């Protein structure tokens, strides 16, 4: 991997472990992209961002990134992908970036919940008036540098690492990195050891 971006993230900081930590809680953060038209071939949409669903198990030792599900889907399929991830991982919290795309997907997600009788709350994630670069650096750089992020191996690894090592680069997508950075707003873990 070449760090063609700002070289904010270094290859030596990347750790892999396929073994799920025994302790911790799951969190899911979603960065929505624009939606494809139903039945669209996607040829003209090649340069659109992906919707990205980051699934992380957090504990006092850091974040274990189970997977990042990503792709370009219509709004119904996006809602189904989110629902399937929540059903599989049973997270403590689910968050979707605030905005028009969130408003578009919520009725479909609510409909799936009603039909399946499986309900969960969806938190609204906000960028807090921070520029994306600042927000991503704040939530991820120190964690990676200090070994507090471990990646599960999966097909998503190459796309994620490409985006991470080239961040920030206007010519490269950053949706997988962005969704992972939003975990910061959901994962409330105490890093303080028990003192006698």
Question: At which residue positions do the language-model features occur?
Answer:
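Short, surface-exposed amphipathic charged segments that create phosphate/polyanion-binding patches used
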Residues: 134-146, 164-167
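Conserved phosphate-binding/catalytic loops in two-lobed NTP-binding clefts
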Residues: 117-136
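RNase H-like, metal-dependent nuclease domains and their acidic two-metal-ion catalytic environment used
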Residues: 1-123, 149-196
């Amino acid at each position: 991997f070449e760090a063609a971006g700002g070289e904010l993230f270094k290859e030596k900081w990347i750790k892999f472990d396929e073994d799920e930590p025994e302790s911790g809680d799951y969190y899911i953060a979603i960065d929505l992209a624009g939606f494809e038209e139903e039945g669209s071939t996607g040829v003209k949409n090649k340069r659109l961002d992906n919707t990205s669903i980051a699934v992380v198990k957090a504990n006092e030792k850091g974040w274990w990134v189970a997977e990042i599900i990503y792709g370009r889907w219509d709004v119904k399929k996006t809602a189904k992908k989110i629902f399937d991830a929540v059903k599989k991982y049973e997270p403590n919290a689910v968050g979707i970036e605030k905005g028009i795309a969130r408003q578009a997907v919520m009725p479909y997600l609510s409909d799936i919940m009603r039909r399946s009788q499986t309900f969960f709350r969806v938190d609204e994630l906000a960028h807090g008036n921070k520029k994306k670069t600042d927000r991503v650096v704040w939530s991820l750089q120190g964690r990676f540098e200090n070994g507090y992020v471990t990646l599960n191996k999966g097909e998503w690894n190459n796309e994620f690492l490409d985006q991470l090592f080239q961040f920030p680069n206007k010519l490269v997508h950053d949706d997988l990195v962005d969704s992972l950075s939003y975990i910061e707003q959901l994962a409330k873990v105490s890093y303080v050891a028990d003192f006698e």
